[in-house]
């Protein structure tokens, strides 16, 4: 899996950064992409990547501010105009359903694919055989969430040598044994799969924050994650201004990573006031608190 940042700016686009959108490529688990936020111009950014709109199976919106949302109608209708019939699920705060339906209705647009819209509240919003996604409330002028993505633990490796030593022949029953099931052999012996399976392989975990000032939910949202994505709208000298608008400073993002035990912090959602030559200074502010910090830029890739 990997994250690709499609937009890393805050509020308005700049020549260097588009507004917010992040793609999570699930390659290695399944042939699909999840999108987190969809600011204006996201579909233009996608055209410059290998991402296929038809393979975007889920979109998670953190909140309904335009720089996280206004690219959604265009992406949905373009996906439809390209003849896509693969279903999609859209998650977001209350009002997301009205926004999409009104945009489509007023523009005389329609979709060629099934779109399920789920208006979320805090708590688990999705789980299947591979992943669990949980929403956490953040502190912002409008209802806003951060999403924690946990890959479920996988069964450990099957010890084929141990099985052979115990006279268990290879065959289709190896799959059942790897799942921890019991299998009855032709000679009548009952073999318990858990006796031959190694320790579970821990799944990966990510925390993707929406816009927020310091909030109580942050430590649980990001507890022990492999990658934490957090906004750093303004530098530490402008922290009071950032907090007054429901945002965080560089140092505040780094403190969340430090206190939650995250392994890596990626900062994004930078004010358009900052140009390329400012980035090293902002990154240094974070690394002074949390050394394992990276700064996202548009189209940056980070393995998960």
Curated annotation (Swiss-Prot):
What NCBIfam families does the record tag this protein with? PRK00055.1-1, PRK00055.1-3, RNase_Z
**UniProt function note:** Zinc phosphodiesterase, which has both exoribonuclease and endoribonuclease activities.
UniProt-annotated binding residues for Zn(2+) 1: 63, 65, 140, 211
Keyword rRNA-binding in record: no
Q: How is the cofactor bound?
A: Binds 2 Zn(2+) ions.
State the family named in the UniProt similarity comment for this chain.
Belongs to the RNase Z family. RNase BN subfamily.
Task: Return the protein name.
Answer: Ribonuclease BN
Active-site residues, as the UniProt record annotates them: 67 (proton acceptor)
Q: What is its EC number?
A: 3.1.-.-
Q: How does it assemble?
A: Homodimer.
Q: Which cofactor does it need?
A: Zn(2+)
Write out the residues that bind Zn(2+) 2: 67-68, 211, 269
């Amino acid at each position: 899996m990997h994250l690709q940042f499609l937009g890393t700016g805050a509020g308005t686009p700049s020549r260097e950064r588009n507004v917010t959108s992040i793609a999570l490529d699930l390659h290695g688990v399944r042939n699909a992409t999840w999108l987190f936020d969809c600011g204006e111009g996201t579909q233009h950014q996608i055209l410059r990547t290998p991402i296929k709109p038809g393979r975007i199976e889920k979109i998670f919106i953190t909140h309904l501010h335009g720089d996280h949302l206004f690219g959604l109608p265009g992406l949905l209708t373009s996906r439809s105009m390209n003849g896509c019939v693969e279903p999609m699920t859209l998650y977001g705060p209350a009002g997301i359903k009205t926004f999409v339906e009104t945009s489509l209705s007023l523009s005389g647009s329609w979709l060629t694919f099934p779109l399920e819209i789920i208006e979320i509240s805090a708590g688990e919003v999705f789980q299947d055989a591979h992943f669990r996604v949980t929403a956490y409330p953040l502190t912002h002028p409008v209802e806003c969430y951060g999403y924690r993505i946990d890959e479920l633990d996988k069964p450990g490796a099957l010890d084929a040598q141990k099985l052979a030593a115990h006279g268990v022949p290879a065959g289709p029953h190896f799959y059942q044994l790897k799942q921890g099931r019991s299998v009855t052999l032709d000679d009548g012996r009952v073999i318990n799969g858990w006796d031959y399976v190694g320790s579970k392989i821990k799944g990966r975990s990510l925390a993707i924050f929406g816009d927020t000032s310091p909030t109580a939910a942050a430590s649980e949202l990001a507890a022990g994650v492999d990658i934490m994505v957090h906004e750093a709208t303004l530098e530490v000298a402008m922290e009071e201004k950032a907090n007054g608008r429901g945002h965080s400073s560089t140092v505040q993002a780094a403190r969340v990573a430090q206190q939650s035990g995250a392994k890596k912090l990626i900062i994004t959602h930078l004010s358009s006031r900052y140009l390329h030559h400012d980035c090293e200074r902002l990154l240094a502010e974070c690394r002074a608190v949390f050394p394992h910090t990276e700064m996202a830029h548009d189209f940056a890739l980070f393995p998960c």
